[in-house]
Amino acid sequence: MARLKAPELRELDVEELERRLAETRRELFNLRFQHATGQLENTGQLREVRRNIARLLTVLNQKRQEK
């Protein structure tokens, strides 16, 4: 998954953010599994996905507090 940018995420609604968060968490699970079995070549993906999750959670919490 490409790097998610906060300004782009702020344009999305809460439901879409939650869907993307679930999808990204699934991706992190799969990457961790690949890493544990020695199949993951680019370990930097783990860091990128973790940071994407953090961005999603940040924007999601900001939107929830606006209400």
Swiss-Prot record:
Q: Which Gene3D superfamilies match?
A: 1.10.287.310
Looking at the Swiss-Prot or TrEMBL record, what is one Pfam family this protein matches?
Answer: Ribosomal_L29
**GO BP annotations, alphabetical order:** translation
**GO MF, any single term:** structural constituent of ribosome
Q: Which UniProt keywords apply?
A: Ribonucleoprotein, Ribosomal protein
Keyword hit for Ribosomal protein: yes
Report the GO terms under cellular component: cytosolic large ribosomal subunit
Family named by the database record: Belongs to the universal ribosomal protein uL29 family.
PANTHER family, sorted: 60S RIBOSOMAL PROTEIN L35/50S RIBOSOMAL PROTEIN L29 (PTHR10916), LARGE RIBOSOMAL SUBUNIT PROTEIN UL29C (PTHR10916:SF0)
Protein name per Swiss-Prot or TrEMBL:
Large ribosomal subunit protein uL29
**Organism phylogeny:** Bacteria, Bacillati, Actinomycetota, Rubrobacteria, Rubrobacterales
